């Protein structure tokens, strides 16, 4: 335990803050929790959580893969181009690293899947589309990615959300398993929840994994 006394407004006890008994969780353990979160989200049909977590997972893999690249968009697209797209069982030029990056920005910043909400899209986007529509296709429908011309300057991109999340999960899982030391040594500070308990009536212990 790492002692760190502090005061909480309305509470006179002493706080001891540190890491959970048994030591810190390593990067692999925390990434495994993200894998599990995506699986559970898909199983419970919480598709918003499944997609946002999948897009965040790409961010994490990209930082491990290209730690010296300071521009997040460049390392994000590099991991997609070098790793993800090369292993997709279905592909389409419109499901590009550029469009996935702008989908990520729209989802995380505005809760939208429309890449055109980003003012940089018209200038920097490649294989531009009118909209990106994550879709739940029938199980018997074999196509996973559709591009529809709706009479506008750019087409609309539809992709199978479950397929995309499952592929990101599978490819990222295989990639981390094949790069264990790289993952362990990466300078990540991944999310984890702190928990608390009373040690005595006047002492609160807060610890995180």
Where are these regions (language model features)?
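Charged alpha-helical initiation segments
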Residues: 2-48
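A structural signal for well-ordered alpha-helices, especially hydrophobic packing surfaces
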Residues: 35, 39, 61, 108-111
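Short, contiguous, well-structured surface segments enriched in hydrophobic/aromatic residues
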Residues: 44-89
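Long, charged low-complexity segments
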Residues: 81, 85-197
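Conserved aromatic-histidine-acidic binding/catalytic patches
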Residues: 26, 41-49, 68, 92-95, ...
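Glycine-rich, aromatic-bearing surface loops/beta-hairpins
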Residues: 196-209
């Amino acid at each position: 335990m790492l002692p760190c006394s502090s005061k909480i407004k309305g509470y006179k006890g002493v706080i001891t803050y540190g890491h959970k008994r048994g030591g810190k969780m390593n990067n692999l353990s925390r990434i495994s929790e993200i894998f599990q979160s995506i699986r559970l989200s898909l199983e419970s049909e919480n598709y918003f959580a499944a997609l946002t977590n999948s897009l965040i997972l790409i961010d994490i893999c990209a930082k491990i893969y290209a730690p010296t690249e300071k521009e997040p968009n460049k390392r994000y697209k590099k991991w997609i181009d070098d790793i993800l797209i090369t292993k997709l069982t279905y592909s389409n030029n419109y499901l590009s690293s550029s469009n996935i990056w702008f989908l990520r920005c729209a989802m995380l910043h505005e809760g939208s899947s429309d890449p055109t909400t980003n003012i940089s899209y018209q200038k920097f986007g490649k294989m531009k589309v009118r909209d990106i529509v994550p879709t739940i296709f029938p199980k018997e429908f074999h196509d996973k990615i559709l591009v529809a011309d709706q009479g506008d300057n750019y087409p609309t991109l539809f992709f199978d959300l479950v397929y995309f999340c499952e592929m990101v999960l599978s490819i990222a899982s295989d990639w981390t398993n094949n790069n264990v030391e790289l993952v362990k040594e990466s300078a990540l500070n991944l999310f984890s929840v702190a928990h608390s308990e009373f040690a005595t009536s006047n002492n609160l212990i807060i610890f995180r994994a």
